[in-house]
Amino acid sequence: MNYKIIIIIFLTVFSSNKLLLANEKIDDYKSSPEGKISNIGNAKYNIAKSYMAVTADPRATISAKRILEAGGTAMDAAISAQMILNLVEPQSSGIGGGAFILYYDAKTKNIYAWDGREKAPINFSESIFLNSNGKKKGFIEAVSGGLAVGVPSLVPMLEKAHEVHGNMPWNTLFDDAIKLSTEGFIVGKRLAQLSSRAPHLKNQETAQK
């Protein structure tokens, strides 16, 4: 099978036949969502011949691997992995933001670029970051919640890219993220720490959705 290569701001899926998480499942990481931080000098590397998926979270990597093994393209795998990342590390890779894609088609040897950077809303004004008394909000309060998010462009970009480079049904690429969110997962340390610094989020309607 000739896999295409995709390089995305949130995910890299390479053409390899061996994967670090070859026999593991998403459920295996319910109690260990984050890998240990170690000296980069001790980092290991792998060489693959058929496909390889690399993400910031093992559950997203496993999801990408599953899609590739089911006959999906690298774009399909990237989308499925992104939905997992949106769930387990929304502070770093949420669908409420934007991204860029560089996609290499091994058959045509063409490189495709997709721009999904978010933009400010048309009616945006600096007053959004001011309190009712006219003074500016603190940093954490200002950047937390829906008002600090630009017009999301990530999902529309993925949908358009999928129309060109994907072959699995669009809705099936959300299955792993839906399953993980429905069954529950342990929140990683970084997300827990950042959430604790923004207790006002529980009172924001936009943050609760």
Language model features: what each stretch is:
Residues 9, 19-20:
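Cleavable N-terminal signal peptides
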Residues 23-62, 66, 74-75, 79-209:
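Noncatalytic scaffold domains of N-terminal-nucleophile
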Residues 15-17:
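N-terminal signal peptide c-region/cleavage motif recognized by signal peptidases
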